[in-house]
């Protein structure tokens, strides 16, 4: 998005406090949704005594999350509120490390893992992930490329986790 688009979006949310509150609430709820459902998935795997899948669904996502975190530090891409003269709607003091979005990476990774285990929850999380990506862009903390890369890498990490489980 460019400066004109961000300005229009910011002005809309500044004029409409209810919409602004909904945006912030959506950011918190969608983030929490993904992060609460991941331990639930692990608990389901544990209760089903699917230890091989449990190990794959813990170890590989952890390594991928670490790899994304290191990559973000190395690339150190500026955030929209650093590159453009805008105030982000989602308050964030962090500088750089915008690419890829770790929030979006995480929810798409968790969605893919759930999809491999139980499709309805996976589909729900994919939809939640799309909304989270939109919220993060509208909120001014990520560019579209950041969230698209996060989603793609999250799905890839989830598929790798499932593939490793299948070949073990």
Q: Where are the regions that the model predicts?
A:
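Transmembrane-embedded, aromatic-rich helix segments that form part
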Residues: 36-39, 125
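Transmembrane alpha-helical segments of multi-pass membrane transport proteins and ion-pumping complexes
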Residues: 65-69, 73, 155-162
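N-terminal transmembrane-helix/juxtamembrane module of multi-pass inner/ER membrane proteins
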Residues: 1-37, 52, 68-96
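Transmembrane helix-loop junctions and nearby membrane-interface residues
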Residues: 42-49, 73, 121, 137, ...
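Membrane-helix interface segments
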Residues: 18-19, 49-53, 80-81, 118-123, ...
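Interfacial segments of alpha-helical transmembrane regions
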Residues: 39-67, 147
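Small-polar-interrupted transmembrane alpha-helices in polytopic inner-membrane proteins
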Residues: 59-72, 123-135
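Membrane-embedded catalytic cores of phosphoryl/pyrophosphoryl-handling enzymes
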Residues: 85-168
